[in-house]
């Protein structure tokens, strides 16, 4: 999921 990638970046 793209959301997972965004959470990791944050």
Curated annotation (Swiss-Prot):
Principal cellular location given in the protein's record: secreted
Subcellular location per the Swiss-Prot or TrEMBL entry: Secreted
Domain of life: Eukaryota
Designated name of the protein: Toxin To83
Tissues and organs where the protein is expressed, per its UniProt entry: Expressed by the venom gland.
Keywords: Secreted, Toxin
Molecular functions per Gene Ontology: toxin activity
Phylogenetic placement of the source organism: Eukaryota, Metazoa, Ecdysozoa, Arthropoda, Chelicerata
GO cellular component, one term: extracellular region
């Amino acid at each position: 999921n793209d959301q997972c990638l965004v959470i990791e970046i944050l």
